Amino acid sequence: MQNFIEQIQKCENLNDLEAIRISVLGKKGILTEGFTKLKGLEDETKKEFAAKLNAQKEIFNKAYLAKFKDLENLALEERMKQDALNFNYFDESITTGALHPVMSTMDKIIEYFIALNFSIEKGPLIEDDFHNFEALNLPKSHPARDMQDTFYFDDKRLLRTQTSPVQIRTMLAQKPPIRMIAPGAVFRRDFDITHTPMFHQVEGLVVEEGQKVSFANLKSALEDFLRYMFGDVKVRFRPSFFPFTEPSAEVDISCVFCKEKGCRVCKHTGWLEVLGCGIVDPNVYNFVGYENVSGYAFGLGVERFAMLLHQIPDLRSLFEGDLRLLEQFR
């Protein structure tokens, strides 16, 4: 047995170790044959011989298991070395990827409002008439409901035309106070130099109990936001109309391209339209069961902001995957 123990200690791999185990404990192994011979021995002799065999088996197993564990660890280390990444193969001159300008612009917008303790709310892309139109105070005759402008399914569901339905879902699920933005994709049947069938919006909503929220609050909040996005620009509010806000306004900033001198982008007005806003219409509160509350809402197109931030003249180029354009935003 001592000879086998010495062979075990000299083993350098698991295959050799297994060969030794078979020669001792295999079907024709030396100890196996010894146990087979016990059948023909008398009781006293059998007892004594069996004790010796069991002692030798225990010594062998102890040596075998210790060596097996050592060799298994060595084999594992070798496999880990073979599977390890060789960082010498990586070429540092290779350029890395980067966020698409639309996504980086959306991230910048979201980060701003998160810092002001706004929540991020999400909703389904496929909406129903109530959440997308009716609860937002859009009458049946409103042109946005027309098949020419909205993607409808056969079951009268539709692809949402704005992220405003998320505001309705949030108000139905929560009580004031609410400070939220709803970023996401929206869909309209439009495709030209400034419109695509799918684009991204960020809409915001602030609702407080009582009559605490005024247009002055809205104006101050949006002026700070627009200067955060575009730097030291002038901001102006123009009266407008949206079914879900009253009063409503469209917001312009001084042209970031020509600095109010007049150019093709601003149509020689010196101003660029960037978003819409207003005080939430009381009819909207009636649809969600709110009473004695006040608030404001606003909405912007992320692609529009990306175009202005990065001076991209054609909106469609953002979705064409042209590497010559996208490589500029690494």
Curated annotation (Swiss-Prot):
Its main location: cytoplasm. It comes from the Bacteria. PROSITE patterns: AA_TRNA_LIGASE_II. Its EC number is 6.1.1.20. It catalyses: tRNA(Phe) + L-phenylalanine + ATP = L-phenylalanyl-tRNA(Phe) + AMP + diphosphate + H(+). One of its GO terms (molecular function) is tRNA binding. Mg(2+) binds at residue 246. Pfam families: Phe_tRNA-synt_N (PF02912), tRNA-synt_2d (PF01409). Keywords: Aminoacyl-tRNA synthetase, ATP-binding, Cytoplasm, Ligase, Magnesium, Metal-binding, Nucleotide-binding, Protein biosynthesis. Transmembrane segments: none annotated. Belongs to the class-II aminoacyl-tRNA synthetase family. Phe-tRNA synthetase alpha subunit type 1 subfamily. Tetramer of two alpha and two beta subunits. This is Phenylalanine--tRNA ligase alpha subunit. It comes from Campylobacter jejuni subsp. doylei (strain ATCC BAA-1458 / RM4099 / 269.97). The lineage of its organism: Bacteria, Pseudomonadati, Campylobacterota, Epsilonproteobacteria, Campylobacterales.
